[in-house]
């Protein structure tokens, strides 16, 4: 895709803020997985798990993750699927 079509960091953060019920920069891991599967590229469960393993900070005690770090890592070192 052309860079213009891929979106930028701010675009991704704005989309994920829709799931940020506490408005504190975190969301449930399951919600992030749902957003990636439903709204983003056509990814299967295995590809999402690979993304999480490569780009995700651990969940906190309540199951929340900081999504801005995830997006930063994903954009700085994209995961390529065959």
UniProtKB/Swiss-Prot annotation:
Under the heading Gene3D superfamilies, the entry gives: EF-hand
Q: Which UniProt keywords apply?
A: Motor protein, Muscle protein, Myosin, Repeat
Domain named EF-hand is located at: 7-42
Specify the domain of life of the species encoding this protein.
Eukaryota
Sorted alphabetically, which SUPFAM superfamilies does this protein's record hold?
EF-hand
One biological-process term from Gene Ontology? mesoderm development
Q: Which GO terms describe its molecular function?
A: calcium ion binding
Q: Name one GO cellular component term.
A: muscle myosin complex
For this protein, the record's PANTHER family field holds: MYOSIN LIGHT CHAIN 1, 3, MYOSIN LIGHT CHAIN ALKALI
Quaternary state and interactors = Myosin is a hexamer of 2 heavy chains and 4 light chains.
Q: What is this protein called?
A: Myosin light chain alkali
* Gene from which the chain derives: Mlc1
